[in-house]
């Protein structure tokens, strides 16, 4: 299946007034995780643009360290995803605690980059955009269009780059099973 790029959402949809933002319910981790995954899928192009702008600024100031940091993060992430497919304990960590899994990848990348001396470039060029994405995805309430787009992505009718990354983190399967459960309840 072909990979489609999600449309760039309007600024007033991406960052509306404060009435469309709310603290997540920290007691219900699955609901919070669903909100984050839904927003990551829906606003993925906006997140990519914001991250590209920040990475460009930091990359312009320190190009070698930025390239080095990007290579290290990609290699560490790929290594952890590969290891998670081969080791049950890592697979469970990745599926049950995706945020912890990403934090472990980022910490491992941090320690590798610290050996080369590019820690500040790593923090501001790579980690800070990821943190901003996570904060926005956690706080932004979903709308009906967001939920509909995510159902289309979840049942496999549309493939996007963020959907592929979330598949690697095994976050899509949970949405598909919830959708299948919902359909079976409706049929009963």
Curated annotation (Swiss-Prot):
Subcellular location, principal: endoplasmic reticulum
Positions where N-acetylmethionine occurs in the chain: 1
GO BP annotations listed: L-glutamate transmembrane transport; negative regulation of L-glutamate import across plasma membrane; negative regulation of transport
GO cellular component: cytoskeleton; endoplasmic reticulum membrane; membrane; plasma membrane
Region described as Required for homodimer formation and heterodimer formation with ARL6IP1: 103-117
Transmembrane segments annotated in the record for this chain: 36-56, 57-77, 94-114, 115-135
Cytoplasmic side: 1-35, 78-93, 136-188
UniProt subcellular location: Endoplasmic reticulum membrane; Cell membrane; Cytoplasm; Cytoplasm, Cytoskeleton
Location of the region described as Targeting to endoplasmic reticulum membrane in the Swiss-Prot/TrEMBL record: 136-188
Topological type in the membrane: Multi-pass membrane protein
Annotated Pfam families: PRA1
UniProt keyword terms in alphabetical order: Acetylation, Cell membrane, Cytoplasm, Cytoskeleton, Endoplasmic reticulum, Membrane, Transmembrane, Transmembrane helix
InterPro entries: Prenylated_rab_accept_PRA1
Family note: Belongs to the PRA1 family.
Quaternary structure and partners: Homodimer. Heterodimer with ARL6IP1. Forms multimers. Interacts with ARL6. Interacts with prenylated RAB1A and RAB3A. Interacts with SLC1A1/EAAC1. Interacts with RTN2 (via first transmembrane domain). Does not interact with VAMP1, VAMP2 or VAMP3.
Protein function: Regulates intracellular concentrations of taurine and glutamate. Negatively modulates SLC1A1/EAAC1 glutamate transport activity by decreasing its affinity for glutamate in a PKC activity-dependent manner. Plays a role in the retention of SLC1A1/EAAC1 in the endoplasmic reticulum.
PANTHER family attached to this UniProt entry: PRA1 FAMILY PROTEIN 3 (PTHR12859:SF2), PRA1 PROTEIN (PTHR12859)
Name of the molecule in the record: PRA1 family protein 3
Organism for this UniProt entry: Sus scrofa (Pig)
Gene: ARL6IP5
């Amino acid at each position: 299946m072909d990979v489609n790029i999600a449309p760039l959402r309007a600024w007033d949809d991406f960052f509306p007034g404060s009435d469309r933002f709310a603290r997540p319910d920290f007691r219900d981790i699955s609901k919070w995780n669903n909100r984050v995954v839904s927003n990551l899928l829906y606003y993925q192009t906006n997140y990519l643009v914001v991250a590209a702008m920040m990475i460009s600024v930091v990359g312009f100031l320190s190009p070698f360290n930025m390239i080095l940091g990007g290579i290290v993060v990609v290699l560490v992430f790929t290594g952890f995803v590969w290891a998670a497919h081969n080791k049950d304990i890592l697979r469970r960590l990745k599926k049950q605690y995706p945020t912890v899994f990403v934090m472990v990848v980022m910490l491992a990348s941090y320690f590798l980059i610290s050996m080369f001396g590019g820690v500040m470039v790593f923090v501001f060029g790579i980690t800070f955009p990821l943190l901003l994405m996570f904060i926005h995805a956690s706080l932004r309430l979903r709308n009906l269009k967001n939920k509909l787009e995510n159902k289309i992505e979840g049942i496999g009718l549309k493939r996007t780059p963020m959907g592929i990354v979330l598949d690697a983190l095994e976050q899509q399967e949970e949405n598909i099973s919830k959708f299948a459960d919902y359909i079976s309840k409706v049929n009963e």
